[in-house]
């Protein structure tokens, strides 16, 4: 089981909130998050309540202040919800599709891909089916830019999920011991 502790000030000072599962509204416990300690497991933190907005992946470690987290690639300064990524030790497999509802060109993916356009000759893809494993998708090649967490399931339309202007350009398996 994972455990993440949110503090309302930098350097683990002030009030804290211990979390060992998903939390859709951290603001119920703290008015702001200034630092984070992940004692075990892996988590996605979200800019808005109910797992909405920009996302950032956290593994076990200490995150002393939001400014440091922003220098690591996090592009937002407010954390309102978090989701625990369950431990997983199996194979990784997904299918990506050029169009909504699993239409158009399809490719099966089983490993990390630092540049989807180069490897698969796809400038864009609009749906996917994650069969096995947990994945991070990135808006730029080489695992840069904003990221999104995808767990096993069918994702028929990125546009319907609120990603209408989004292009995923690289993807990585979450292989950490979460």
From Swiss-Prot:
Gene3D superfamilies: Crystallins (2.60.20.10). Residues 2-40, 41-86, 92-132, 133-175 form the Beta/gamma crystallin 'Greek key' domain. SMART domains: XTALbg. Residues 87-91 are annotated as: Connecting peptide. The keyword tRNA processing does not apply. Keywords: Eye lens protein, Repeat. Monomer. GO terms for molecular function: structural constituent of eye lens. It holds the Pfam family Crystall. Has a two-domain beta-structure, folded into four very similar Greek key motifs. Crystallins are the dominant structural components of the vertebrate eye lens. The keyword Repeat applies. This is Gamma-crystallin M1. Belongs to the beta/gamma-crystallin family. InterPro entries: Beta/Gamma-Crystallin, Beta/gamma_crystallin, G_crystallin-like. GO terms for biological process: lens development in camera-type eye; visual perception.
